[in-house]
Amino acid sequence: EEGLPSPAQRLPEPLQRIRQETGIRPLINGGVVIKYNANQKYTTDAVSAAVFGEICRRAGVPVQRYANRPDIPGGSTLGNISCAHVAIDCVDVGLAQLAMHSAYETAGARDTAYLCRAAEAFYASAIRRDGEKIRLETEK
């Protein structure tokens, strides 16, 4: 089984850049964001990120990566709580946004199209595990 939780990804506010991991900065209209957290507040791991990244590559969808600084608490998703009760591989993805949860929330129109295309490709894919091997079959 596979899961695709899809919360939004807050972009660092100009005055709060200290909260993001150095060198990782998603951009609006830069593609779908794969979210990582060293304290496991997101479900993404190396395998799920690699599989989802390959699905996106085959679908022509750009991918960005984001990680919170592990020493500063940030948001989380329900995905990691759900995965604790059901054995499925999951990857947390979203769209880069400014002013999340405000009346002026802003995201890119291209990113919305990218996420739709990524979700279509994900649900049209067959991900098979055989021991340590993973086989990915996607519709052409």
Predicted regions and their residues:
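Active-site-adjacent substrate-binding region
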Residues: 4, 8-102, 130
